[in-house]
Amino acid sequence: MPPPRSAGILLYRRLAGETEVLLIHPGGPYWSSKDVGAWMIPKGGVDEGEAAQDAAAREFEEETGAPLVAEPTPLCRVRQSGGKIVEVFAAEADFDPATLKSTEFEMEWPPRSGQLRRFPEADRARWMTLAEARRMMLESQRPMLDALEAKLQSMR
C-alpha cells in the first residue's frame, strides 16, 4: 500500500532582493503553545482522482481563505516523519496575513470531556525570510526551502 499523499503550496515573494515565504501556524490546542518548529506550508490530503497540483491549490484556499492567484509549479517531494509524501508546488505571489480565514475542524476538547469544539486549521500566517523559516517550520518540511533556493538560483 503506498504511503498517504498530501500536496501543498510554498508561496514566496521577493522584496528588496530577499526571498520570503508564507508559512501558517496550525490551530487547535495541541499547537497553541508551540511556535519554533511548528510552522508549515498550507497543505492537505489529495482526494481520490484529484491531481496533486489541484489539491495543493484547494488546500491553500481552505487554509488561508484566499484563492491561489499565481500558477503553481512543481518544486519537490518531501517525506514527513510519519511516512506521508508531500508534493510541494511553488508559486510567487503576495498575500496579506491579516486576511487569513481558515476552515475549521472539530474535536473533543478537553480530552474525554464529551464536548466538541471547533478550531481553525491555521490560526496565524506570516511572511518569513528563508533563514527565519528554517528555524520556525517543521523540521520535516525544511528541505522545501532548499528546493526553492535551488529553483530561484537556476532562474537567475
Regions found by a protein language model. Give the residues of each.
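Non-DNA-binding regulatory cores of transcription-related proteins
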Residues: 117-123
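Residues that scaffold the ATP/ADP-binding catalytic core of kinase and kinase-like folds
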Residues: 33, 49, 136
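The catalytic Nudix box helix
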Residues: 41-75, 89, 129
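Charged phosphate-binding loop/patch that engages nucleotide di/tri-phosphates or the phosphate backbone
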Residues: 126, 130-156
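N-terminal strand-loop-strand
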Residues: 1-41, 89
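Short, charged/polar surface micro-motifs in flexible loops or helix N-caps
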Residues: 15-18, 28-31, 47-48, 82-83, ...
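Membrane-topology and secretion signals of cell-surface/extracellular proteins
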Residues: 36, 40, 66, 84-86, ...
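Active-site-adjacent beta-strand/loop module that shapes the phosphate/pyrophosphate-binding cleft
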Residues: 77-114, 126-128, 148
